[in-house]
């Protein structure tokens, strides 16, 4: 039943029936943990991979010993970095040892290796002053994958791919004649036996003895024309290196570098783990019948007798006893199953090895050698440490290759299973740490090359580590990754939810991932393994659908990068759920039967029903309670945070829920946020983890509170913590970040308590919109097609008013003609235009500005022009050289307005770091209050979006029996066809709750049922059907039928009409066609397309049409004359020929068509072509002011280009005597044979 729950400072009445057994993990730990791992272990791994660097003779050895991030010497704090456009980073110091083997001399030095970007507490990076997020990438895990295709006769042809993290691929395929082929590194096919021979099994008999008598393998041997190991090696060499003379030695070294060299071939830890899991004996021989006795190689005891069935547990023992291969009997055929010979170390040694930290399986032959040669614990541990790279090889080994071939052979007989590439057990996450590690590795390997070169060139006696190291390649690799990688994204900072979702995003795109064009339907589709790991709902609509996903609420990422989800363990004996929680990866979960979280249980966790609904893979089954393995921890475990914030999600259609999840991320923070009356209970957790709320670092007592800072006296040592609040700062999306304290003086706070609200939060809960009194009623057609009718009250009371802050900057540079200057003294500007500009030439804070107003006065020197005689005379008399400058002030762009809230000035003199050539930089921040207006987009949380069609006076809105008018009218027809009934239930429950004075939590899939809502309605004193008689505000008459009225939570989205509306009279024109540019950003015009032309033709509006196609578009002369005529008030002249017509003629002439333009009298009309001088003669500048002009990419900014040419021309001495007739006119053929 409904019960109170304390959420932060607010009490909500919760309808949830499932008690959460486990805490939801920190929502941004996918970012924080990954980066922390990188600093702790990831960097070590890279340095270990590259160690040691030796020169070609081997007498100089350079080693990276240790590293540290120098946290004391961080240049600026996070806030300062944002202000100064700096990168938040710490210097990386590496201690390096250089050893000279000839002299035995050792030099150690600490070398600075560049600034390394640091992650903020919120899981973001500040790069050049902008907050960025590194999105995690979903990629295929390295490992071995088996698949099959079906040929024309319906036979299954098995194929397989061995995918390393980096290195050559191995692909096996079968043709319809049952011959198995292999491709090495995407080259031509070879028979599989050639590969096996090259790995050391020379003759046919050896091959058959090793792999067992198998028909397809025999067929492959017959197809193969090599008979010995050497021939096989040469054959492979010919395929891989065609055109080079094949020798056995070069073939052996080629195969070694391709597969067995850790620098060239890397399986990575994940790859090794997947390999061992797939190729181990236990899963392959379980439940099969043994064809021979299986003997333990160490003790000689018989583990399974011939003809016995091998159970799962025994299979596990066989695997860990180091048995290399097992013969099983299938339909009277003996099939040999070969493993890759890896065993569990714990089962092989008698003592405790937990201090070695080895979790993986180890290579049995290597281990056996160690155990045979050593007996005491200490030396065995020492040897294991020494040989760790052999015990757990990072590259592939011969045993792996034999096992993959054996697996391929066994598939035909049902031994083993094929893989599903879209299964989350085969896809893994590359998070920040790993992406950074890969980038750092690239930088280091480039540096390694430089170091080797320098070792050879420089004097070996005087050499020091510092001289060898060049940090440029490393710094460049890191910078490139943060600056331009597809996965390093500008943080979506519209509201706290959008920040949080951005950090939890999973992308299948990016380097090493898929591309939009190639991704098929299967990759994008929802898969059963997504359950509890990836949200099935939240994904963009459009070309990226299904490629960009969101992490589910309870999901975690394990050390291998696989996504895990928690389940409660069921005690099968007693049929009760324990409180033990375990995290499972997708392939571990596949064996289990999982009950849902809502399954009724008594207080001891015993199932109430005898039969239970469970999920197994993609099936839902009903089984007795004794068969249940696991139970979901929570009902919201399958969805992401944004989706979990939609109440009554279970009553919505999935595609509308998708829109609801996506639109919540676009909600603009309002002036006074309001938490939803009908919430889901996750709002508090989401706000706290998003990082927008200041939290108390230590427990204590609040001693001082103001709008901009909070002081807390610590309990531990009596010191004071000071928390500065952000006031009216601009976010990445141009919304306003403002924090307000929610604690009082004298209040006791505990550690990590929220002490202030941020943007879009209310008492520490996410509050994206407002609770609005609304009704489902049509009103005079203003609800047509999802439009919304709103009351003037929402405008007057600033219910949906939001703050937007735009940033404009102006820099004074050095030009070739002298420095630009920021000043109040601007030529040809009236005093009125400078009324708010101070004596520095910068606008004052608090001034109200409109488009075209000067923000920063700036003048740029102009080139000296030729003076006329009169001017020279005046100059001579008055002796002053007129300052030749032009006005290049920063003005408010077209269509913008607001109030100046902040000015920042950076100058060289103050020691600020500026770009080269910049002397001064001024930033202005303009804030606007945007009230809700017609054309703004609003939405509910259920995908019910619409545009405001009319703002009606309050007195005309339909009103309730108690006289209160509605605030919004929505169209009732928007509900049934879209099947998002959740909004109706929300309205009912909100109506009851607002009268009872409750805030409600109705968790997704575990929320209020219809009887419970009805009960609340009756408790609040309403009709059961929740309908009300409404009265028409214009006449006072009641409407014919009762109407559903209630409280709906409505958001104002970021698509505001003020940003979309746009007008142009004249402005920039395209270079070739001379037509106006398009789009608001380019200050372009509206395209009058073919359909619009048809409309005018149908009207017969010939003159309008002619005007649109000529003077309003690309008749260059005509448009200038028209402009003049309008200014002077004369009649508009006849249009000329449009430029695009001339372009068309030129294109036809380029096709060798002789085209002439004739007039009515059939006389040729010459089309004049314009050169720049003619353009200059068209005096009027109708391209708009210089600020609005879009710079053409080819045109240089300054005039230096033209001037240089003039000087060159002046220096040429013309030789008068040359006669043009004497010059050679014939082309000699030699001219063509010139090298150029």
Curated annotation (Swiss-Prot):
UniProt organism field: Clostridium beijerinckii (strain ATCC 51743 / NCIMB 8052)
Example GO biological process: DNA-templated transcription
Protein name (record): DNA-directed RNA polymerase subunit beta
Purpose: DNA-dependent RNA polymerase catalyzes the transcription of DNA into RNA using the four ribonucleoside triphosphates as substrates.
Molecular function, one GO term: DNA binding
Acidic residues composition bias: residue spans: 1194-1212
The organism's place on the tree of life at top rank: Bacteria
Pfam hit, one: RNA_pol_Rpb2_1
Reactions catalysed: RNA(n) + a ribonucleoside 5'-triphosphate = RNA(n+1) + diphosphate
Family, as annotated: Belongs to the RNA polymerase beta chain family.
Subunit text: The RNAP catalytic core consists of 2 alpha, 1 beta, 1 beta' and 1 omega subunit. When a sigma factor is associated with the core the holoenzyme is formed, which can initiate transcription.
Keyword Transferase among UniProt keywords: yes
Gene Ontology cellular-component annotations: DNA-directed RNA polymerase complex
